[in-house]
Amino acid sequence: NRHYENVRYPDSWEVVKMGEMVRIISGVAYSKSDVTVSGIKVIRGGNIQAGEIIECDDDVYIDNRYADPTNNIYKGDIVLVASTGSQQLIGKTGFATRDYVQTQIGAFLRILRPKDIRCADFLNLFFQSDYYRQYIRSLAKGTNINNVKNSYIEDFVIGLPPLQEQNRIVAITNKIFYMIDEILAGL
């Protein structure tokens, strides 16, 4: 992508396409007649808030015949809003901090499953960045519905530090976010 053409990275960093780092998994399509009071919970766009996957009062459940372990949400997965009418919501992501039992994603979402789970926290930081969101918004524009094509994610080029450096970046960033949360809580 042209935004990275003039970026210089330390020699120890690799320049990789996101498709080398994550596997993209599509969500389940179902009809209203498939909705039940229990079974498999379906995560939808409203469940993705502030970088997290949350429970909602209006969560939907579908019949267990839709069960597919590949489409379950596992710790380290990044859930992406891939189709929506809102430019503000397109591309937003939520990070799975645990396995979600009996839970899959709806058809308008995608799971970005890190190929190396050790990189999950670093990739999550990247997908929370304004840089990523601006990139996605610039590509996903539609007349009514905005869509993130898999190729937008797969072809996106990032700088990837060695694992030890990834962990250091994540630790420092998390510490800063924690301090910000503490300050905001005190206001």
Regions found by a protein language model. Give the residues of each.
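Catalytic cores of nucleotide-enabled group-transfer and carboxylate-activating enzymes in metabolic
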Residues: 9-20, 112-126, 135, 155-164
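Specificity-determining recognition surfaces
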Residues: 126-158
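Non-catalytic DNA-recognition/assembly elements of restriction-modification systems
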Residues: 1-28, 159-187
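Sequence-specific dsDNA recognition surfaces
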Residues: 19-32, 46-78
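A short beta-sheet element
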Residues: 44-45, 67-128, 149
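Short amphipathic alpha-helical segments
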Residues: 5, 108-110, 152-156
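Short coil/turn segments at secondary-structure boundaries
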Residues: 31-38, 138-140
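Short proline/glycine-enriched turn/loop segments at secondary-structure junctions
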Residues: 32, 100, 144-147
